[in-house]
From Swiss-Prot:
Disordered as annotated region, ranges: 1031-1182
Protein name per the record: WD repeat-containing protein on Y chromosome
WD repeats: 155-199, 323-362, 366-405, 456-495, 508-547, 595-635, 740-779, 823-862
InterPro entries registered for this protein in UniProt: EF-hand-dom_pair, Quinoprotein_ADH-like_sf, WD-EF-hand_domain, WD40/YVTN_repeat-like_dom_sf, WD40_repeat_dom_sf, WD40_rpt
Alphabetical keyword list: Repeat, WD repeat
Record field: compositional bias (Low complexity): 1079-1092, 1103-1121
PROSITE patterns noted in UniProt: WD_REPEATS_1, WD_REPEATS_2, WD_REPEATS_REGION
Organism the protein comes from: Drosophila virilis (Fruit fly)
Length: 1182
């Protein structure tokens, strides 16, 4: 909306107020009004003289413009009007020298980098972690087994020290804690305070260690003793230096005298004898400055009279004494800031420049006990100090002011424990406190950018506003903060803390800000709080201009600022009007008529026409803006019914019944002695549960007619009702604005032309509705170009299936849902829209305020530590076609719709064409055939498939990573391995077939000798049994029948042993599908088949082929074969071919051994595995 305002302060010039949404040209808008960037010292001096010479030393709008043109500073009309409104802080359209200079100062303050580092929350805001120490006595020392050096090189210091990506803070990169107690016990803890191991060692009073990770600089081990001496051991960290493990020596003891004499070449000693006259309390060596710091306490005031060197800095041969009364107990050296912070028994914290020892830069007072620990956070500009009474104080390093006093340690640690040890982990930003308990306190922890983009406020954001004059965003939160942001750079310009407060029992309590708005010229800010207080702010300089209040302790839920009037509504159930006219602003406020019967939850105004207010019980009342008189009243439960503007008897009865039922239910919860409620009363009460109104919105561009829906009412049921604010108008339509059960719209906004409606829900969803043709006459409806909307809103593009958001509105043509995505994890309390760059901003209950493009792309979170996207108020955001990222917290819970809308990427998909009937029939036939084949051949194996076998124990879910230190000479590998407990292995049962083979006799598988031995012919006549002969009746006639007798080999005895020199090739057997270890028995003589033994006197070894024998079809060359467990069928030796060229032997050769009279059972056996012996023909055998 464009607002025109004419003032008569300057008779020669009228001021016309315009915004960036006005009709000004683009060139004029881009001209900056940053006067402090264009003015010089000489020009400022000349302007001062012109102000002094002006009448009354004040100038008007035209006079100031002529003065600026005299010093060569020119602006166009649009830019100068905005500049004059910014300078005119008194709102009187006259400018004096003080206002002019104040505007220049504010411009320079906005560019101050220190204003960006002011914290929104206390440095120590998280609950501490407490654990038992597991020591027998109290902890006397605590330190850190470091993985990284605390002394970061100066060239590695960057601005990213305030946030981490998660990997740097892992325990593997953070080291281990080490605690020691008086009994000499050491315990090692992980970074998350998990116990690792314990050991026993001798205690050392004072020690410090300095090293670099790169290993280029010698490490320093600094020792301080009771006599005030300081000794330094320097050594190279290469291959662990003198700390290398030696085989057979678990502990190496050194004598200091041997170290001084140089008997240990790896150690370079240096001594500072009697550096202090008292016990060394703390030592530190700075590698960056190559300087030693050592402190001591001097409590004997009579002896030293307050001129004691509490801290001595030694650099080469130069010594600087920092003289402090009572000495120094602890100190901290910040090499980044070049400062030294000391604390001692005098309860003062002193800040020194390391190069100036004459006097401290600042003295911080406030402790009531001696200082026992100090440390500095240079990135946050904070100093932490702990006193003897266990009170932690946080100081600002630049302003030297107290930020926080933390006293929870007094509650956690018993008052009798006084010897407490402290250690600060600079990498994790954690303070470890050790006594009889281990306490871990987080001090300004880094932001995990892998989990969140950061927070805008320290509490839920309640109101977010955009100022069109100064082009900035103002956020108000329940932490009572008001913050001014530059949305184009993401920088925080101004922060105002403790805006609304009240005193309760002497303690100042912050009050939550619940409502806010700007004045018509958008120069001042009006805020309302939960206690009923109202304040007017000049938020450019954080000055309260005026204080007001409605009824005490009544929350302000809505504020409206129109010309010369301020309207405030809340839990007082009426409208309170304050004057905004000069001279009458401090009079009594005007109370409008009290027609509401419940608390007012929301309100809105249409300039020049009317005001609408809504209550928790669903009442809606339209008021005349000029007179404050109501003219229409509705109830959202029955919106079409006309309700007179008075309480009748029926409404009073319903009100009394509702109050009665509420009281009865409350009493029934507290006590069971109350009588039961009647069923009809419960039914009546359930039917009259009120539906509350969450938000109302006036459409400023729609006229006041009966046909135009100009008011949108959001209910807690998720429905938005549309009304006409005409006298004879009323309820028109309603639509469902959510897609999840239990959700509702909490805030609404629209653009300048009322084309889109932006809603924020209780579940964190942001929805955009196209309302151009919704609830207007058909004659005024316009054509909607859907392709253009699909280009801007990716939500409208087609998907493979309807998502939840689209399913809820598929039968709802108007209004059209053009975008829906989850923007926050919690409820959205405020939403707004910037017209020219098309940016949506939302404030949520999750402490953040985020910026989005109109299409749904994520631009950033105000207050983030990450780099900000490049934005400008004159160009549309989101048109660079780059890849947009998702908020880390939303990425974990986002749906497919949210991922598509925020990222702007829609994955392609293909729709399958429905197949014809013939193709489906063919596929069915193929499937049936495949099923039959599978049923026949592909039967599943029986369980268990592997049989009974030994199963290995399962591995741990966490893989054990073993890293061996190869620098040691002796590596005990077994200490790194995980050994499983030994268990008795189950003896597997022996298979029945193996047991049968073991008990069998190999002679049972051969034919008995039925014939007689002819000694003259030296032949063995073997006759087959009749039963076996009958089995061969069906043999194939094409193959020659196997002979039952052996071919006449030459033998030397009746036992049938072959003579030496006989040819083995004439008595050859072919073995098929049998074991190579087989023996053949024939009559009294036996032939043994052994491995690799040649026959005596034979020219070459006779081998038996293990391959399947080939049967020739020629009857002149028959070949015999036998099966496993069957009688042997031998062919005539005359037909056997013994030539090696015709048959190749297999790799596993077998030869007949002439000297063996008996076959060995272990080497030659034919077992009947397949059953009883059975004679077959040659064709069946093959």
């Amino acid at each position: 909306m464009s607002l025109v305002y004419f003032a008569s302060g300057d008779s020669k010039a009228d001021i016309e107020y315009q915004t960036i949404s006005s009709t000004a040209t683009q060139v004029s808008q881009e001209q900056s009004e940053r006067l402090h960037d264009r003015i010089s010292k000489a020009q400022l001096q000349k302007l001062y003289e012109l102000f002094k010479s002006a009448p009354g030393q004040v100038v008007g709008c035209g006079d100031l413009r002529r003065m600026l043109e005299d010093v060569d500073i020119t602006f166009n009309d649009f830019a100068y009007t905005r500049l004059f409104l910014k300078i005119n802080q008194n709102h009187d359209f006259m400018v004096d020298w003080n206002e002019f200079v104040s505007y220049l100062i504010f411009g320079f303050q906005e560019e101050d980098p220190s204003s960006q580092k002011e914290a929104l929350i206390m440095p120590i805001s998280m609950a501490p972690v407490v654990r038992k120490t597991e020591h027998r006595s109290a902890v006397c020392c605590i330190t850190l087994l470091k993985v990284k050096s605390d002394q970061t090189p100066m060239e590695e210091i960057t601005e990213s020290a305030n946030y981490s990506f998660g990997g740097e803070d892992s325990p593997e990169n953070s080291g281990m804690w080490v605690t020691a107690s008086h009994e000499g016990q050491l315990r090692f803890w992980s970074a998350h305070m998990e116990p690792l191991r314990s050991a026993v060692s001798e205690s050392i009073y004072c020690m410090s260690y300095a090293f670099y990770n790169n290993g280029k600089t010698h490490s320093k081990l600094v020792l301080g003793d009771y006599a005030g001496n300081v000794r330094i051991l320097s050594y190279s960290p290469y291959l662990r230096g003198p700390f290398q493990a030696k085989p057979g020596a678990a502990l190496v003891e050194l004598v200091w005298a041997d170290v001084l004499r140089g008997r240990i070449p790896l150690l370079i000693p240096r001594e500072y004898i009697n550096l202090h006259n008292e016990l060394i309390s703390c030592v530190y060596f700075s590698l960056h400055m190559n300087t030693l710091f050592a402190s001591a306490e001097y409590r004997n005031t009579k002896k030293y009279r307050g001129r004691c060197p509490g801290l001595i800095m030694v650099s080469n041969e130069d010594r600087n004494n920092f003289r402090i009364p009572l000495g120094v107990s602890v100190f901290y050296v910040s090499e980044i800031k070049n400062i030294l912070v000391t604390g001692g028994p005098d309860t003062f914290v002193r800040i020194w420049d390391v190069y100036i020892s004459s006097e401290p830069s600042a003295i911080l007072t406030g402790h009531n006990g001696g200082i026992v620990a100090v440390f500095v956070q240079p990135e946050e500009n904070k100093v932490y100090s702990v006193d003897y009474h266990k009170i932690i104080k946080v100081w600002d390093l630049q302003e030297h002011t107290l930020l926080q006093t933390y006293g929870d340690l007094v509650r956690i640690i018993h008052h009798s424990e006084t010897d407490i040890k402290y250690y600060y982990h600079s990498h994790l930003r954690e303070l470890m406190v050790a006594g009889r308990k281990l306490i871990q306190i987080k001090c300004c922890p880094r932001v995990r950018v892998d989990l969140t983009d950061g927070n805008t406020h320290a509490a839920p954001v309640s109101v977010v506003l955009y100022n069109r004059l100064f082009r900035n965003i103002v956020t108000c939160g329940l932490d009572s903060y008001i913050i001014v942001w530059d949305p184009w750079t993401g920088r925080r310009k101004i922060i105002m803390k403790n805006c609304h407060t009240k005193m309760i029992y002497g303690e100042t309590i912050d009050i939550e800000i619940t409502a806010a708005c700007f004045d018509p010229l958008e120069q001042f800010l009006l805020t309302g709080a939960r206690d009923g207080s109202l304040k007017i702010w000049n938020y450019n300089n954080a000055v309260v201009v005026r204080n007001m209040s409605i009824q005490p302790d009544q929350e302000v839920t809505a504020v409206i600022w129109v010309v010369d009037r301020i309207l405030a509504m809340g839990w007082d159930r009426q409208v309170t009007e304050f004057n905004d006219v000069e001279g009458r602003e401090y009079g009594d406020p005007k109370k409008w008529a009290k027609f509401h019967t419940d608390d007012i939850t929301c309100a809105d105004v249409k300039l020049g026409e009317g005001v609408v207010t809504a209550t928790y019980s669903g009442e809606i009342i339209f008021w005349k803006l000029e007179t404050g008189q109501p003219y229409r009243r509705y109830n959202v439960m029955d919106p079409s019914r006309f309700i007179e503007l008075k309480l009748n008897a029926e409404e009073e009865k319903l009100t009394r019944r509702s109050k009665r039922m509420s009281s009865l239910i409350g009493v029934n919860r507290r006590s069971t002695s109350v009588q039961a409620i009647k069923p009809d009363e419960i039914k009546d009460y359930g039917a009259n549960i009120p539906v509350s109104v969450q938000a109302v919105l006036f459409l400023q561009r729609r006229p006041m007619t009966k046909e135009h829906g100009s008011v949108f009412i959001s209910l807690d049921t998720g429905i938005i009702q549309v009304y006409s604010h005409h006298q004879h108008g009323g309820y028109i339509k309603q639509f469902t604005a959510v897609h999840k059960t239990g959700d509702c719209v909490l805030t609404m906004a629209t653009d300048r032309k009322n084309r889109f409606l932006y809603t924020g829900t209780a579940f964190g969803y942001i929805k955009v509705w196209h309302i151009v043709n919704y609830c207007i006459p058909k004659a005024e409806q316009t054509y909607v170009c859907m392709p253009r909307l699909r280009l801007e809103f990716i939500f409208l593009r087609k998907e493979l299936f309807l998502t939840r958001a689209k399913r809820m509105v598929r039968f709802q043509p108007e209004p059209m849902l053009v975008s829906s995505y989850k923007g926050h994890l919690k409820a959205i309390n405020s939403i707004g829209f910037i017209n020219l760059p098309k940016i949506i901003f939302s404030g949520s209950h999750d402490y953040s305020c985020r910026l989005w493009t109109q299409g749904g792309r994520y631009l950033g979170t105000l207050g983030t530590v990450l780099p900000w996207s490049k934005l400008t108020p004159f160009e549309r955001a989101g048109e660079d076609n780059r890849a947009y990222r998702l908020p880390p917290d939303i990425k974990k819970v986002a749906s497919s719709t949210t991922l598509k809308v925020i990222s702007g990427i829609q994955h392609s998909f293909t729709l399958k064409r429905p197949k014809a009937a013939e193709e489906r029939e063919e596929e069915r036939e193929v499937e049936d055939t495949t099923t039959d084949v599978k049923n026949m051949f592909e039967r599943p194996l029986r369980e268990p498939i592997l049989g009974k076998h030994f199963q290995l124990p399962g591995r741990s879910a966490i893989e054990q990573r073993i890293e061996l230190d190869t620098t040691q000479l002796y590596i005990p590998v077994y200490t790194h391995l995980r050994v499983y407990p030994s268990e008795m292995l189950e003896a597997l049962p022996t298979s029945p077939i193996i047991s049968q083979v073991k008990a069998e006799n190999y002679l049972d598988h051969y034919m008995p000798v039925v014939g007689k031995v002819d000694l003259n012919t030296s032949a063995i006549n073997i006759k087959e049994p009749q039963k076996l002969a009958r089995t061969k009746a069906g043999a194939n006639l094409d193959q020659p029948r196997a002979s039952a007798g052996w071919a006449k080999p030459k033998t030397n005895s009746i036992l049938g042993i072959p003579r030496a020199g006989s040819s083995l090739g004439k008595a050859r057997a072919s073995v098929s599908q049998g074991s190579p270890k087989a023996g053949v028995s024939s009559g009294y003589g036996k032939v043994s088949v052994s491995q690799g033994y040649p026959r005596a006197g034979s020219p070459r070894p006779c081998t038996t082929s293990l391959s399947k024998p080939k049967t020739s079809s020629s009857p002149s060359k028959p070949k015999g074969s036998f099966r496993l467990g069957s009688p042997i069928a031998a062919t005539s030796p005359a037909n056997a071919d013994s030539s090696p060229g015709k048959r190749k032997s297999s790799p596993g050769k077998r030869s007949f051994s002439p000297g063996k009279a008996k076959a060995s059972p272990g080497k030659a056996r034919i077992s009947s595995v397949l059953g009883k012996p059975k004679a077959k023909t040659d064709r069946e055998t093959h």
